[in-house]
Amino acid sequence: MVLTNSKQPRKQRKALYNAPLHLRNSVMSAMLAKELKEKYAKNSLPVKKGDTVKVLRGNFKGIEGEVSKVDYAGYKIIVEGVVNKKQDGNETAYPIHPSNVMITKLDESDEKRFKNSSN
């Protein structure tokens, strides 16, 4: 998906910030694990609710959990088990950018998701 044909970083950023929600899906892609790359002949796929991902970067590196929410407006995903502890003891979900995770298990309930893949 191309949001803009411009090479200028400022125009690319502006296109990213002003992109409609139905086009933000392809920007929210994460790399696939080795087995999934071989199975689907793709390097990355858009993250969906129900996928299992492993965090590769940041303070939560190494944690594996299921995606519980995809925030297209903020370009972030919420992963179960990735929580911030607040001062009063409560835990809040910590949003992560999809480029910092790897999909280890796909939610295969959506048949349309794989209709164009080789398998």
Curated annotation (Swiss-Prot):
PROSITE patterns: RIBOSOMAL_L24. GO terms for biological process: translation. One of its GO terms (cellular component) is large ribosomal subunit. It comes from the Archaea. CDD domains: KOW_RPL26. InterPro entries: KOW, Rib_uL2_dom2, Ribosomal_uL24_CS, Ribosomal_uL24_euk/arc, Ribosomal_uL24_KOW, Translation_prot_SH3-like_sf. It holds the Pfam family KOW. SMART domains: KOW. GO terms for molecular function: rRNA binding; structural constituent of ribosome. The keyword rRNA-binding applies. Keywords: Ribonucleoprotein, Ribosomal protein, RNA-binding, rRNA-binding. One of two assembly initiator proteins, it binds directly to the 5'-end of the 23S rRNA, where it nucleates assembly of the 50S subunit. Located at the polypeptide exit tunnel on the outside of the subunit. Part of the 50S ribosomal subunit. PANTHER family: 60S RIBOSOMAL PROTEIN L26 FAMILY MEMBER (PTHR11143). Belongs to the universal ribosomal protein uL24 family. This is Large ribosomal subunit protein uL24. The lineage of its organism: Archaea, Methanobacteriati, Methanobacteriota, Methanomada group, Methanococci. The gene is rpl24.
